[in-house]
Amino acid sequence: MTNLKPSLIVLSLFFSVELFAQLTVRNNAYIFVDDQVLFVEDDVNIQENTANIYLRNEAQLLQGTGTTGNSGIGRLSVYQRGTVNNFNYNYWCSPVGNTSGNNNANRPFTPNNNIYDVTAAPITSSLAAYTSGYNGSSSPLVISSAWLYSYNPGGQYSDWDYIGAGGTVAAGYGFTMKGTTGSGSNQLYDFRGKPNTGEITVQVLAPVAGVPQSTLTGNPYPSALDARDFFHMDPENQAALAGTGAGALYFWEQNSSSHVLASYIGGYATYTIDSGGIVAYIPAPWATYDAAGNVTGGVGTSPNSTPGVDVPGRYLPVGQGFMVEGAANANIYFRNTYREYWKESSGDSHFFRSQDQNASEDQNVNEDTSNLLPSNYMRFRIVYDIEHNSQYFSRELLVNMADYATDDYDYGMEAKLSETFPSDAYFVCENVPFGILAVPFYLDRKIPLVVKVHHQQNVKFRTYALQNFPDDLPVYLHDIDNNTYTNLRIQNAEVNLAAGTYTNRFEITFQSETLGVEEINDTDLMVYQNNTTSELTIKNPNSYQINKVSLYDITGKQIFDEVKLPINTEYTFSTKKLSEGTYIVKVSLENQTVSKKVIIHN
């Protein structure tokens, strides 16, 4: 056991990493960890109330699989910065609990015991003050207790619970807190208390009469949390969250300038992550975006400002809170094995930033995941733009396409929307509105798109952030009623719609099937693979003019593109050098395109 006595101060700036089997800090001693990781295999005992551990400049505490639990009535101190002003909420989850009891259990978080005002000195802080008024202030730190709430499961339903300054929140559960005046959107908080460790249990509820039940939770540790491990390394978490679309984290976004509930502008961003660590994320539908996907405004504004957004990455930072929806009455679990040392400044770990503030750097909403896609994983985004009472917003939808996706619900690759609005757009999976969809790619794939319109108006459709798409592969919006195809890679689609919900009018396709006067059937044009001769064969008994023959693999990669073909009754193309697998043949005639799936075995 490492025992730090009153006369000994350990400064981690002398070491790259501190490693301990157990760690005890005694009376009037402290450990100062600067921009490093402190790893303790078993327990941390900050024994007396004058003993402290200070984590500074993104330093973090990691703990191993020991089962003893932390003890003592001293405090660990770790900073985290809020990202909203006094009118807007951050969702938090405290990394520490109160120090009112000396045992080995994680302690509840109490605002007026655990949140401190940061001063210029790196180890000196004082407890934050509280006001019952609606507005807090930054210097000195005064927090409005009016906005301190948790959202927890009850006997049957989940609901908001007021905690105020002196209430408690069990370890692993989250809480809401508004920002302060005088700090912009960057108030710095000092969380001080007993560090959480080990297995932490949070209750979730199954839907009630079809209505999802949410729990406000978050990262409960003084270190980053690997969201992939949280989603995929624990069968109990999968069972609790893997109902239709429930395997998602929901981050609150808000852009309000009033405390009046009716004036709130906000919604939930949707996040999920697959077993390979690929993040899928869409923002809440109140902001507007330009053609490049950059945020250009929010509801109630013309799209001319340039607020930014920090997108959650794979590693959830200290203090990050979020909502989850239960698929069953069960528990979800946080464990030390999910903890990682990952600094926010290193990328792929951001405390969620609402879009109500100016950012010093241009953040694209898919910036931190675009370089994570394997070559056989395609992705694109559809944006539905709408105006309502001179207010503009965009619903962003995401489509993931990979050969291991299915047409059913794929946990970690797709996610339901937390809510829909009178004017909205979404996909449908197992009769549930989805904002993130995952399907295998086929050239003849059709993706139905449901569109809702509150009142008659022009609506727009766009696409952006296409990843691993062949340059010549179109993304069409098919208006079934008008039988029109708009290639969204070339131009936006705009259509005037009467009020209503359109469930069967729009779909996303990758080929145009507009027919001429003469419709060609299978006997007029036969396309098949002759594996005996290793040839792709096209029989054209009526001698149609064939303008082009293209072959694509299952990922959409073009294998060949034959043009300016003479009129013949039969064409053959060698496939000897191609890998075995499924391919799509696309035959383009004057007024029609015929697609056929073939399987090549050499």
Spans of model-derived segments:
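Bacterial Sec-dependent N-terminal signal peptides
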Residues: M1-N27, T514-E518, K557, T572, ...
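Extracellular beta-helix/beta-solenoid repeat scaffolds
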Residues: Q22-N85, Y189-G198
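Glycine-rich, histidine-containing beta strand-loop boundary motifs that form or position
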Residues: E48, N57-A59, F87, C93-V96, ...
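Extracellular, surface-exposed repeat architectures
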Residues: A59-N113, V202-A206, V211-S223
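Surface-exposed beta-strand/loop patches in extracellular or lumenal glycoproteins
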Residues: Y89-P122, D229-E236, Q456-F469
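Extracytoplasmic redox metalloprotein regions
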Residues: P95-A206
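Compositionally biased Ser/Thr/Gly- and acidic/asparagine-rich
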Residues: Q156, Y162-A165, V169-A170, M177, ...
